A protein has these predicted regions:
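Conserved beta-strand scaffold positions in the cores of enzyme catalytic domains, especially
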Residues: 121-124, 155-157
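C-terminal helical "tail/cap" subdomain of flavin- and related membrane-associated enzymes
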Residues: 116, 124-126, 147-151, 167-170
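A conserved FAD-binding loop/helix module that cradles the flavin
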Residues: 157-185
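Active-site-proximal substrate-binding core of FAD-dependent oxidoreductases
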Residues: 122-128, 183-186
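FAD-binding beta-loop-beta segment adjacent to the flavin cofactor pocket
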Residues: 68-78, 129-164
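Generic C-terminus detector
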Residues: 33, 111-112, 149, 157, ...
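Mid-domain catalytic core of redox enzymes
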Residues: 1-110, 114-115, 120, 145
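Residues at alpha-helix caps and immediate loop-helix transition turns in enzyme cores, especially N-
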Residues: 100, 104, 138, 142, ...
Length: 186
């Protein structure tokens, strides 16, 4: 028996199993992690939505507003640094080319600088998240069919992406405890 936390669509592809229902959709996200000199109008918030950003992102978050340990040790005492993540959504699996990522990163840094969120970026690190948000077609039975097919082969799906559901960290921890308890007696 196997406990699996990989995204359901990837697990189905890896195993070669198929079901009758069409696969449910998902969204991918490009995350720009930015270490920067804090600008004069850098918000104190954990994150903000910007659906009208010219460079195309939808959310900007401030790691260092959540916890200063997201800053380099040398910058924690100074109030002049900020660590940021910037998210841009894409249709599932439609990863941009390296040239597109580079152009987007430059445009995003320029926009954040114009807004006064940052003075200058010191580090920009893009990360592609293939399965970031999962969805279900109305009336879909794909998740149930796929989960049953995998269980028939001893593969038990736990966690947000494996179960193709939106859930928080507490739900994922609960799933882990339940799954571990069910294996304990066998």
């Amino acid at each position: 028996r196997v406990l699996c936390t990989l995204p359901l669509n990837h697990t189905m592809a890896m195993t070669g199993l198929t079901v009758e229902a069409r696969p449910d959709p998902y969204s991918s996200v490009l995350v720009l992690n930015i270490g920067a000199v804090k600008g004069p109008r850098c918000p104190p918030h954990h994150w903000l939505y910007h659906p009208d950003a010219k460079s195309g992102f939808h959310r900007v978050g401030f790691y260092s507003n959540v916890d200063h340990s997201f800053l380099p040790t040398s910058a924690r005492e100074r109030a002049s640094a900020v660590s940021i993540y910037v998210e841009r959504a894409y249709p599932g699996g439609q990863e941009p080319s390296p040239a597109e990522v580079s152009a987007y990163a430059e445009a995003t840094v320029r926009e954040l600088t114009e807004w006064g969120y940052i003075e200058r970026a010191e580090v920009v690190d893009p990360t592609w998240i293939d399965v970031a948000y999962t969805w279900q077609w109305p009336g879909s039975t794909y998740t149930a069919q796929a989960t049953r097919a995998l269980q028939a082969h001893g593969i038990y799906m736990i966690g947000r992406y494996a179960r193709w559901s939106f859930q928080g960290i507490a739900d994922s921890i609960r799933d882990g405890f339940y799954a571990g308890a069910s294996f304990k007696d066998s």
